[in-house]
């Protein structure tokens, strides 16, 4: 029994010396730092969960829009295929009904293949394209596709202008002097 008392005393002495080596203020500081880090990690986790939820919502919205635009493009392609098929069919009918006239058309030069042919002057085309780009964003409304059908389309060729022009062409200073 005496040995057990000395062992308990020896182990008690050993534990008390180990506990005396550890500073309780340092332990409390470590615990406070860990609680502070835990709070920060919880806030960060909450922010990441909110961001993830928002990202999922945006992804769903964009996926829906992408699917809608893809369907629109597929439908437009089908419509164009039908239109071109009808055009080929009409060409075939015209070739059968009026073979001489149809052959004469193919022998004459085609204006569409001529790179120098431009029905609108460059300045007007640039002005129209720039005004459309600046007033509309990436919108697929009919006003972008066909400006002539839009009520908001501004016809620049009909507007009074301070610069002299003839037949839609802007005159240079020399031409203005000769014009007067």
From Swiss-Prot:
Residues 126-180 are annotated as: Disordered. One of its GO terms (cellular component) is lysosomal membrane. Signal peptide: none annotated. InterPro entries: KXD1-like, KxDL_dom. It is found in: Lysosome membrane. Pfam families: KxDL. One of its GO terms (biological process) is vesicle-mediated transport. Keywords: Lysosome, Membrane. Residues 126-144, 158-170 have a biased composition (Polar residues). PANTHER family: KXDL MOTIF-CONTAINING PROTEIN 1 (PTHR13511:SF0). As part of a BORC-like complex may play a role in lysosomes movement and localization at the cell periphery. Associated with the cytosolic face of lysosomes, this complex may couple lysosomes to microtubule plus-end-directed kinesin motor. May also be involved in the biogenesis of lysosome-related organelles such as melanosomes. Belongs to the KXD1 family. Associates with the BLOC-1 complex. This is KxDL motif-containing protein 1. It comes from Xenopus tropicalis. The lineage of its organism: Eukaryota, Metazoa, Chordata, Craniata, Vertebrata.
């Amino acid at each position: 029994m005496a040995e057990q008392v000395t062992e308990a005393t020896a182990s008690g002495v050993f534990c008390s010396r180990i506990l005396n080596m550890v500073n309780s203020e340092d332990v409390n500081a470590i615990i406070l730092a860990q609680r502070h880090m835990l709070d920060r990690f919880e806030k960060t986790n909450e922010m990441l969960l909110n961001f993830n939820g928002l990202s999922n919502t945006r992804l769903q919205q964009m996926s829906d829009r992408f699917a809608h635009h893809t369907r629109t493009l597929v439908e437009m392609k089908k419509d164009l295929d039908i239109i071109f098929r009808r055009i080929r069919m009409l060409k075939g009918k015209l070739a059968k009904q009026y073979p001489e006239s149809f052959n004469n058309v193919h022998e004459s030069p085609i204006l569409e293949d001529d790179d120098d042919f431009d029905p609108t002057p460059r300045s007007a085309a640039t002005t129209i394209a720039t005004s459309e780009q600046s007033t509309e964003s990436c919108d697929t409304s009919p006003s972008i596709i066909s400006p002539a059908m839009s009520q908001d389309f501004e016809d620049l060729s009909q507007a009074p202008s301070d610069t002299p022009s003839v037949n839609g062409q802007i005159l240079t200073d020399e031409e203005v002097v000769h014009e007067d």
